[in-house]
């Protein structure tokens, strides 16, 4: 882990928390909270200027732990008076699985909280699955999150807080945007989070430690591909257009063949990896014909297929394929030249497995509706 693991957050922490015991600080309006942990150096510089801290102090806010003395006592007071806070909040709750997986509940938006999942591996790797939205607009038939409706986009601070505020934060080797929400539907916040994770002034992670999963929003996917070098995971689940649309309404707007055509224009043979997520359902998409159609769809790409066991969420007729069928599907793809593996199911006993995240309602509130 880089030595500057908490550079930007701890630097801001020193600035803001230093004022907490300062009797000269004015009373802060508790309703005005402006988190700093989701800001880029340029944005932090703007904050410094806005509260009359010398312009040069904006950069140390983002890059230095020990040099926060560059912020005067009065400067720290002015930060607090303007409503700025670190924005680092502990999880509201956590639930541990028998397999070591831990599900965390965080404050969300729109009357909903959100969940993230810590997944440790025996080989020392540790992955955090983060959420980007409260609820989701995609309405996939097999996903609990989609059934909650859409309640709002998380801010950059709320996303990065999931990563920085769990007890195992320093142990993380990977972050995957596979929690609640569609990342490309909240792309500005997701891109800012990736910048914070990968930039030298931030946590200095390699982009290879980050994977973004998407249903295939083509404009958002193109922008993500152009602006980052992170790994990409595409939720396919069926290569048959009619069947996929029944499972994933997004197919109507962004046909999977057009998504794959876009991906063929990018290099996934070297540093960046492309994977395809494919949940198997008994008698739906687990047949030899389904396998062959999927293999044809993926020709000309360097995609690897992650076969995912279905975790029933109730309220539908979908059933998981047997282990034997999963293995036959995997072996058949491998025989056709498509690398395929079966993803190990983690956290199912605490409703933390793929497709099972739902968050919690803080109060009764209808789903958010975009203004027409």
Show which residues each predicted segment covers:
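A short loop-to-beta-strand scaffold at the N-terminal edge of the catalytic core in hydrolase folds
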Residues: 113-118
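Canonical Radical SAM [4Fe-4S] cluster-binding loop centered on the CxxxCxxC motif
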Residues: 120-157
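Glutamine-centric residue-chemistry signal
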Residues: 133, 158-162, 326
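Conserved AdoMet/S-adenosylmethionine-binding subsite of the radical SAM
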Residues: 167-174, 179-343
């Amino acid at each position: 882990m880089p030595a500057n693991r908490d550079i930007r957050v701890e630097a801001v922490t020193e600035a803001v928390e230093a004022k907490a015991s300062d009797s000269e600080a004015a009373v802060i309006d508790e309703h005005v909270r402006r988190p700093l942990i989701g800001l880029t150096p340029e944005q932090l510089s703007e904050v410094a200027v806005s509260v009359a801290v010398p312009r040069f102090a904006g950069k140390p806010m983002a890059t230095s732990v020990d040099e926060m003395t560059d912020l005067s006592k009065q400067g720290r007071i002015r930060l607090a008076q303007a409503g700025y806070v670190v924005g680092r909040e502990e999880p509201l709750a956590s639930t541990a699985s028998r397999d070591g997986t831990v599900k965390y509940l965080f404050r969300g938006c729109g009357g909903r909280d959100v969940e993230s999942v810590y997944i440790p591996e025996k080989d020392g790797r540790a992955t955090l699955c983060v959420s980007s939205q409260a609820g989701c607009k995609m309405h996939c038939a097999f996903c609990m999150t989609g059934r909650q409706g859409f309640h709002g986009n998380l801010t950059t601070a709320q996303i990065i807080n999931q990563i920085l505020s769990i007890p195992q934060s320093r142990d993380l080797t990977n972050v995957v945007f596979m929690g609640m929400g569609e990342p490309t539907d909240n792309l500005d916040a997701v891109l800012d989070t990736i910048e914070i994770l990968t930039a030298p002034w931030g946590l200095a992670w390699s982009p290879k430690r980050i994977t973004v999963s998407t249903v295939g929003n083509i404009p958002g996917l193109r922008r993500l591909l152009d602006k980052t070098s992170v790994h990409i995971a595409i939720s396919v689940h069926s290569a048959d257009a009619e069947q996929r649309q029944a499972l994933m309404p997004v197919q109507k707007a962004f046909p999977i063949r057009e998504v794959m055509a876009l991906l063929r224009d990018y290099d996934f043979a070297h540093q960046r990896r492309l994977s395809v997520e494919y949940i198997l359902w008994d008698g739906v998409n687990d047949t030899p014909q389904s396998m062959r159609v999927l293999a044809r769809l993926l020709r000309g790409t360097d995609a690897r297929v992650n076969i995912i066991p279905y975790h029933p969420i109730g309220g539908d007729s979908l059933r998981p394929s047997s282990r034997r069928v999963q293995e036959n599907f995997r072996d058949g793809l491998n025989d056709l030249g498509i690398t395929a593996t079966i993803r190990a199911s983690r956290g199912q006993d605490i409703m933390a497995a793929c497709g099972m995240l739902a968050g919690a309602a803080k109060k009764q509130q209808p789903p958010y509706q975009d203004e027409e």
